[in-house]
């Protein structure tokens, strides 16, 4: 009985780890779609805003 409970516990733990990994991958892919990492216009705009802030 103890072995069964240990196997069941290990199986549940493994399932949770896999589920969390899948959720993390999904969140990352959704974030990448929503906020592209390489956005030259965003970089230029950020530089412009920072330079204006420093000059004031």
Swiss-Prot record:
<comment type="similarity">
    <text>Belongs to the MazE/EndoAI family.</text>
</comment>
<comment type="function">
    <text>Antitoxin component of a type II toxin-antitoxin (TA) system. Labile antitoxin that binds to cognate MazF toxin and counteracts its endoribonuclease activity.</text>
</comment>
<dbReference type="InterPro" id="IPR013321">
    <property type="entry name" value="Arc_rbn_hlx_hlx"/>
</dbReference>
<protein>
    <recommendedName>
        <fullName>Antitoxin MazE</fullName>
    </recommendedName>
</protein>
<dbReference type="GO" id="GO:0006355">
    <property type="term" value="P:regulation of DNA-templated transcription"/>
</dbReference>
<dbReference type="InterPro" id="IPR048242">
    <property type="entry name" value="MazE"/>
</dbReference>
<keyword id="KW-1277">Toxin-antitoxin system</keyword>
<comment type="subunit">
    <text>Forms a complex with cognate toxin MazF which inhibits the endoribonuclease activity of MazF.</text>
</comment>
